[in-house]
């Protein structure tokens, strides 16, 4: 079986297509026409494990700070993330704010997310449910540019993130989605598979590709709609 055949067969699975439909409008567009397209941002690919640096959302694991869900240690204020006067410890907070076109939603998330020193995952789910009708109609289009913006902010604020990114060397960062069930994981990350006796990570790995580019260029390019706001104000420049 060729690699491209494997990818096409995986995407023929209706369950996977349904999962990917939550993050991309056209699942067919994810299929590469050649192995040379694996590096394109929104293309599925097979990435040899020996060329990858996997990371997961678990404190104490290697490259932990590369994950959007990673927490800056409590009290390490020099590495806290800052958007204007909003100070927070987890990049995912800023990322999911951009999903909703509502200052009320942004303030609710800011004021309700933190429970003591931990981020309450239940509040994230409540946020998406409470304000679902206010989700940006173009979210599937703008989400990767918004992620680039968020990563730029994290790179500027967090030395732990810069350290882990540099430690990857020339290898490809991969958000390891093996064994996870989140619908978007094979878009942002990739899972461990075996094809023709060789181990690969399979997925779009959009986050990993953005990180690889940021390691090289420091600042990721992005283009956001003029009507995209946070807290009722225009997005701050980075």
Task: Place the predicted regions along the sequence by residue.
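Charged, low-complexity intrinsically disordered segments
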Residues: 2-238
């Amino acid at each position: 079986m060729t690699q491209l055949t494997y990818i096409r067969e995986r995407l023929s699975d209706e369950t996977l297509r349904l999962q990917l439909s939550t993050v991309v409008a056209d699942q067919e567009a994810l299929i590469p026409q050649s192995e040379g397209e694996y590096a394109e941002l929104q293309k599925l690919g097979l990435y040899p494990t020996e060329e990858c640096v996997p990371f997961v959302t678990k404190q104490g694991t290697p490259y932990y700070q590369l994950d959007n869900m990673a927490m800056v240690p409590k009290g390490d204020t020099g590495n806290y993330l800052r958007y204007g006067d909003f100070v927070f410890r987890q990049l995912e907070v800023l990322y999911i704010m951009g999903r909703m076109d509502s200052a009320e939603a942004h303030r609710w998330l800011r004021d309700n997310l933190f429970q003591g020193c931990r981020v309450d995952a239940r509040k994230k789910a409540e946020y998406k449910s409470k304000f679902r009708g206010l989700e940006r109609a173009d979210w599937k289009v703008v989400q990767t540019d918004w992620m680039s913006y968020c990563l730029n902010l994290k790179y500027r604020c967090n030395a732990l993130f810069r350290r882990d990114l540099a430690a990857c060397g020339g290898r490809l960062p991969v958000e390891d989605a093996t064994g996870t069930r989140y619908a978007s994981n094979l878009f942002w990350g990739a899972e461990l598979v075996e094809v023709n006796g060789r181990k690969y990570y399979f997925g779009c790995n959009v986050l990993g590709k953005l990180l690889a580019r940021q390691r090289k260029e420091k600042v990721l390019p992005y283009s956001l709609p003029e009507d995209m706001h946070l807290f009722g104000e225009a997005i701050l420049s980075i």
